[in-house]
Amino acid sequence: MKKYILSLDQGTTSSRAILFNKKGEIVHSAQKEFTQHFPKPGWVEHNAQEIWGSILAVIATCLSEADVKPEQIAGIGITNQRETAVVWDKTTGKPIYNAIVWQSRQTAEICDELKEKGYSEMVREKTGLLIDAYFSGTKVKWILDNVEGAREKAENGDLLFGTIDTWLVWKLSGGKAHVTDYSNASRTLMFNIHDLQWDDELLDMLTVPKSMLPEVRPSSEVYGETIDYHFFGQNVPIAGVAGDQQAALFGQACFGEGMAKNTYGTGCFMLMNTGEKAVASEHGLLTTIAWGIDGKVNYALEGSIFVAGSAIQWLRDGMRMFKDASESEVYASRVESTDGVYVVPAFVGLGTPYWDSEVRGAMFGVTRGTTKEHFIRATLESLAYQTKDVLCAMEADSGIELKTLRVDGGAVKNNFLMKFQSDILDVPVERPVINETTALGAAYLAGLAVGYWKNQDEIKEQWHMDKRFEPTMEAETSEELYAGWKKAIEATKAFK
């Protein structure tokens, strides 16, 4: 009896295996961290073999601790840190260099050169992205240009490229399936999101041979099976793949046009489903593919906030204002307001809609009466203001007014933050019972492909709300507070 779906969530700092049942509930999970490599300032790399080892380890731990047999698994879904690039030898199956992580800035110079050559507009039109070291394309070029003999091997068809999903499917299937899904392909800077093909003009710009690239498939489909020696003698269908933020949008059941979710992790990622049309952004958002399913492709607008949960960690570890992140809510609730204090947590620059990597964090409105409580509250409020910045851009680009915002991620446990978020946006904020929406989204995609769940309507009914936060703040007050934030942003940008 096929009782479960196994979701593999390969993140930036750890790998997780999560078993879900028919109701979309977590049966068991296992997690394993792996090493971060920083060869030079601003560079971030992972050992792809170590990632693969961590995946095998969490699968084994999860199944044995849950006392679940491999033959009880109906299918495997994979979700992954996006943009991180792996290049490996087709014959030996070994990576020729470390995986270059999405956060890594080692290709910034390549990006500057491409911008100087005037490629920005063409890239934006075809991919919906900006030329930035964040995306996979320049990472692949860097590996081919800097690893001895790599370019020659690539030209001869001996090397393969993949984002982490591709690497894991390739390994699980014993090298039989070299595939990715639409959502991951749309983050590479090499994929045309309108005609759904690898784009020759983009590949020429990056000097990447087409033979390296995986086949692009829908996000919910059987791509292959596990090879028995990697999966306890069983051939289990590998049936769903999506990048982490898109998987969270699916896990939140944001299937309708205009539905949006915000994930509060280290940073924040807000995605709005724009249906079957790619909406070009005039306000600093990315246009991306949400997923491909049932012969259709859904698009999304995406906003990135670089610092969110990490600002709370900074209060805890850097400023030593409390011992546990949950205490931030207690302190923030002790004061009626920030008393005019604003914190702009631009520790690594500002993301959407400003895209300014030069600015740094700042604090405004401090008086002799400012206390620790004001400071903590102002830092928490900054997450809500940044989210409003992104939402304003989304509404302007899409022409869609948001009805409710679904939220997930570590910081959503903070009731003060969620209530303030609702007040500042003037829309209800909904927190689900199951917060593991990324892994759940991948499980749903896999389950649909193997018939474990019938359709998206069945999934929609499984979304249950833990708490709904309604806006109660006077419009005049919230507008005044937000105007103060915009002033703080301008002042921060002026100080460089």
From Swiss-Prot:
Pathways per UniProt: Polyol metabolism; glycerol degradation via glycerol kinase pathway; sn-glycerol 3-phosphate from glycerol: step 1/1
Gene Ontology annotations for the cellular component aspect, listed alphabetically: cytosol
Residue numbers of Phosphohistidine PTMs: H230
Regulation: Activated by phosphorylation and inhibited by fructose 1,6-bisphosphate (FBP).
Keyword Kinase appears in the UniProt entry: yes
Chain residues that bind ATP: T12, T13, S14, T266, G309, Q313, G410
Enzymatic class: transferase
EC number: 2.7.1.30
PROSITE patterns xrefs: FGGY_KINASES_1, FGGY_KINASES_2
Keywords from the UniProt entry: ATP-binding, Glycerol metabolism, Kinase, Nucleotide-binding, Phosphoprotein, Transferase
CDD domains (alphabetical): FGGY_EcGK_like
Catalyzed chemical reaction(s): glycerol + ATP = sn-glycerol 3-phosphate + ADP + H(+)
Positions contributing to sn-glycerol 3-phosphate binding: T12, R82, E83, Y134, D244
Annotated binding of glycerol, by residue: R82, E83, Y134, D244, Q245
A Pfam family of this chain: FGGY_N
Residue positions binding ADP: T12, R16, T266, G309, G410, N414
Post-translational modification: The phosphoenolpyruvate-dependent sugar phosphotransferase system (PTS), including enzyme I, and histidine-containing protein (HPr) are required for the phosphorylation, which leads to the activation of the enzyme.
Keyword Iron-sulfur carried by entry: no
GO biological process: glycerol catabolic process; glycerol metabolic process; glycerol-3-phosphate metabolic process
Gene Ontology molecular function, alphabetical: ATP binding; glycerol kinase activity
PANTHER family in the record: GLYCEROL KINASE (PTHR10196:SF69), SUGAR KINASE (PTHR10196)
Family per similarity comment: Belongs to the FGGY kinase family.
Function statement: Key enzyme in the regulation of glycerol uptake and metabolism. Catalyzes the phosphorylation of glycerol to yield sn-glycerol 3-phosphate.
Subunit organization: Homotetramer and homodimer (in equilibrium).
UniProt protein name: Glycerol kinase
Source lineage: Bacteria, Bacillati, Bacillota, Bacilli, Bacillales
